[in-house]
Amino acid sequence: VSAVEQSAFGPFFTVEAHAADETPTPPWRSVSGLVDGSPSLGGRISAVRSSLAARMAKTAAEVDLRVAASVTHLGLIARILAPTIAAATRGVRISQAPDDLWWQDRLGGPFPLSVLKTESGQREGECSAVPGAAVESITRCVVGETGVSDRVLWGNVGSAANSAAQLIAASRPALTGAARDIADTYLRDPRVDGGVLRAGPDFRRRSCCLIYQLAEDRTAVCGDCVLETRTGATG
């Protein structure tokens, strides 16, 4: 999938590409830095926590660390899975090895992401690395860093996969089936709500990403949340 085709699905799908023999230079950094025990992940969570606090006119200490951790995790995972799923619908596999993914640590929207240049012809659904090393490693490290429930975080993985499929379907209806099939390779993972959910407009996760706690309003939940009701959702 070309960069132009990817970007047509939305900003979360836009990627740059680098060769295997290239080394990231600032502001680029390897995703491996988020999962190697360095301060990068904790720093990202702290920055998100401060940003959320500023938006809610609170202090950082007033934002539950678990909420900031879940928001951080969902943002990272959604950014990685969106282009991965889009590429896979066209038969292209994007490596999810942390060393093969570069990112720029920015807030305020989808951060820049660069992926390893790959050859066409291998579908992500045919690859054994599903959900993928980056997804698994980031999820494990967020749990270790903050103690947030792994059920919440794997629910985030499901939400990210389904959201990517829905955005692709909305932009390119002809790819609806392919996008949902690829998303389902993630949703079948037993860590994602038992592996029984499937992609589509009726997707409803069995956990909450905790974002509603920022508004202190139980009705301010995402449309795919276990807490969502038809009369009380905000999207």
Identify what each model region corresponds to:
Residues 38-201:
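Hydrophobic, aromatic-lined core segments that form the binding pocket/scaffold
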Residues 27-30, 145-149, 171, 228-231:
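General structural signal for secondary-structure boundaries
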Residues 11-15, 30, 105, 113, ...:
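Intrinsically disordered, low-complexity regions enriched in small/polar residues
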Residues 8-11, 27, 97-99, 109-111, ...:
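Generic structural motif recognizing short loop/turn segments at the entrances and edges of beta-strands
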Residues 205-230:
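Local cysteine-cluster metal-coordination motifs and their immediate loop/turn environment
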Residues 8, 192-193, 233:
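Intrinsically disordered, low-complexity segments enriched in small/polar residues
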Residues 1-67:
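Generic N-terminal leader/targeting and pre-domain segments
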Residues 82, 86, 93-95, 217-220, ...:
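Nucleic-acid modification enzymes, centered on SAM-dependent nucleic-acid methyltransferases
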